[in-house]
Amino acid sequence: MLGDVAIFGNFSCGLDEKSRMILPSYTECEKGDRVVFCISDIGEEAIDLYPLFVISDLISRCDELILTSTDETIVMRAKEEKRRICSSALVQANIDVQRRLTVNPLIREILGTDSNKYFCIGENNRIKLFSNEEKFKEYIGHSYIKR
């Protein structure tokens, strides 16, 4: 299942005539897996693709902190994180039997391109999609510098 293991590496992919993207085999996705397209935390023409269960787990952890923590700062941070997660989620989709995922018109509009070519990087439990190769290369450069 997508997200059960760390996803590393980068790849480029195109869309077929029905706006479907084929996920690489190392993402370990299966037919029927539900994923969520979210606005990226970097906010620069990028979309994050998370398994639905990861989003659900993050929200559950935030709820638990809100209910159990006695530290007001932690409660406020958990509320803000939950708000950010819920407001960034855009579209849910299913992965089909041939490992294809439909890229919704809203997602293509947010990525700001009419192109059918996307640049992707796997990061732990998500895939980050870029439509702009320069932004992708810039992000990869910054990612390696951070480590």
What annotation goes with each model-predicted range?
Residues 1-13, 17-18, 26-98, 105-147:
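Flexible "stalk/tail and boundary" regions
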